Amino acid sequence: MGFNIAMLCDFFYPQLGGVEFHIYHLSQKLIDLGHSVVIITHAYKDRVGVRHLTNGLKVYHVPFFVIFRETTFPTVFSTFPIIRNILLREQIQIVHSHGSASTFAHEGILHANTMGLRTVFTDHSLYGFNNLTSIWVNKLLTFTLTNIDRVICVSNTCKENMIVRTELSPDIISVIPNAVVSEDFKPRDPTDSTKRKQSRDKIVIVVIGRLFPNKGSDLLTRIIPKVCSSHEDVEFIVAGDGPKFIDFQQMIESHRLQKRVQLLGSVPHEKVRDVLCQGDIYLHASLTEAFGTILVEAASCNLLIVTTQVGGIPEVLPNEMTVYAEQTSVSDLVQATNKAINIIRSKALDTSSFHDSVSKMYDWMDVAKRTVEIYTNISSTSSADDKDWMKMVANLYKRDGIWAKHLYLLCGIVEYMLFFLLEWLYPRDEIDLAPKWPKKSVSNETKEARET
């Protein structure tokens, strides 16, 4: 029999992004392996209630108040009744939460631990220690992950960051990278490429991403004019939206780059490949990055990558596919971009093999199989005493400083009082079980993983 798994996160379709696509593709491959998966997220405008996606993937859109960038208002306890009801209806065995900034992820782990379920958390981001937001998120994560069964990070740098932020044992933290659907990011047809080069003897640099400060938008608005002034045959395509969008508009107008810089705004994910295939170079100026899925997608389209070396980026692609900036600065990024332009112009590097290499390196089925190994491990080796409420409350008291530990302890006690109240008001044996979508039998790979 396969596992019954619940993915919890504030971020999911119709919003598009790296976390959202990670959850979707991982869930689809887990279903292909014979497991049952539901996703619990908040409502998005008219998407309220239960929706079914491809392959029988069920999504619960729970109506909750959203405060900032699709994150729900944190209340600690108010989500417990509905999440408990869903977990019992779906006979969930493993709760897998995603994202340090997701309220649903944090509260879902807390409620699942209280109910005695196995819990897994995947972190997709890097956080610092020198601003109020990072400190708050780190403290919250320390509380939430006190009784976690396993943590997954998308890069080794992300793992190191997680250990420092939460003081968790490295033994319970695994590294499983993101992946890409290489079939969705095939390079342009060689004949089309030849025709394009004959009709427009230009080098096109593509930038795709959310236009936020942490994604290097301030750097890009200074880099693009410098590169354009140095190379008459270079054009830019910028796709994305965010608070820095107006800065790009002002940059284009002030430097009179209307004919050389296309500002596309937000682009649907199904159109990202079409945008990438118009370019020769992909420029990534991010200030912080745990993995960088867009780099893999761009390389899969045979683009040469110019990027910073922050976070987990150096782990993503081999050196022959990338040109790194020595420092995260305008001058170094301009220098790296100039180097990439000269490589493309002189045809010193054949990028036509990038797609095949990427398709061999990254595959969602491999990610799913490695994740199932973690599910199997925590289900077979963990003791029932690990979810004893006295032990978990004691663990909360041992965490952090004198004030924090008492706050954690208070939250833990109130959580268990609410748990017993819900068990009395809404007994689990009176909750109707949801019928399961007809699924495949568990694959041989999963059986072998369990046996080993």
Swiss-Prot record:
Topology within the bilayer: Single-pass membrane protein
Cell compartment(s), UniProt: Endoplasmic reticulum membrane
Highest taxon in the source lineage: Eukaryota
Enzyme Commission code: 2.4.1.198
Reactions mediated catalytically: a 1,2-diacyl-sn-glycero-3-phospho-(1D-myo-inositol) + UDP-N-acetyl-alpha-D-glucosamine = a 6-(N-acetyl-alpha-D-glucosaminyl)-1-(1,2-diacyl-sn-glycero-3-phospho)-1D-myo-inositol + UDP + H(+)
Keywords from the UniProt entry: Endoplasmic reticulum, Glycosyltransferase, GPI-anchor biosynthesis, Membrane, Transferase, Transmembrane, Transmembrane helix
Catalytic EC class: transferase
Key word Hydrolase present: no
UniProt pathway: Glycolipid biosynthesis; glycosylphosphatidylinositol-anchor biosynthesis
Single biological process term from Gene Ontology: GPI anchor biosynthetic process
Coiled coil: none
Role noted for this protein: Catalytic subunit in the complex catalyzing the transfer of N-acetylglucosamine from UDP-N-acetylglucosamine to phosphatidylinositol, the first step of GPI biosynthesis.
UniProt record similarity statement: Belongs to the glycosyltransferase group 1 family.
Protein name: Phosphatidylinositol N-acetylglucosaminyltransferase GPI3 subunit
